[in-house]
């Protein structure tokens, strides 16, 4: 009974400590890129007396919650940005480094996956169509008939044709000579 009470008190105290801790505010800047312009949105709630700084230098005439950077340049406009009010601290910085282009389109992961799957399905479909088309074409083709009798030479007028004249460019194989290529399939040496 004592152990149950001990474990119960321990669990309640751990829960109480976990709920009473001060959670640090997790404020996040919002970045929106459209064409060659980049828009930063300040995470602070107040709209009054907002100031923007870039790399420690205050940006003049930028007191709105949204900071729009037209014709963003990766070299000139990249750096640390912070928005703050005189009453708040400058403790949440945003490091911005972006590449922009005028005619870029952002594609998410699901769109890329769908494009790849559709491409594979179309390719496999075309392969199946070509396979069945060629299979049907072979079945409809006339079989190749050979001449009468054994062998592939046609019989008839060419029956009395003499054997071809040996080519003088090649030397005939001598029977007494045992070279590497002097005969075919002669395994007994």
Swiss-Prot record:
This is T-cell surface glycoprotein CD3 epsilon chain. The lineage of its organism: Eukaryota, Metazoa, Chordata, Craniata, Vertebrata. Residues 23-99 form the Ig-like domain. The gene is Cd3e. PROSITE patterns: IG_LIKE (PS50835), ITAM_1 (PS51055). Residues 157-174 are annotated as: NUMB-binding region. One of its GO terms (molecular function) is identical protein binding. Disruption phenotype: Absence of CD3E leads to the complete absence of mature T-cells. Thymocyte development is arrested at the early double-negative (DN) stage. Part of the TCR-CD3 complex present on T-lymphocyte cell surface that plays an essential role in adaptive immune response. When antigen presenting cells (APCs) activate T-cell receptor (TCR), TCR-mediated signals are transmitted across the cell membrane by the CD3 chains CD3D, CD3E, CD3G and CD3Z. All CD3 chains contain immunoreceptor tyrosine-based activation motifs (ITAMs) in their cytoplasmic domain. Upon TCR engagement, these motifs become phosphorylated by Src family protein tyrosine kinases LCK and FYN, resulting in the activation of downstream signaling pathways.
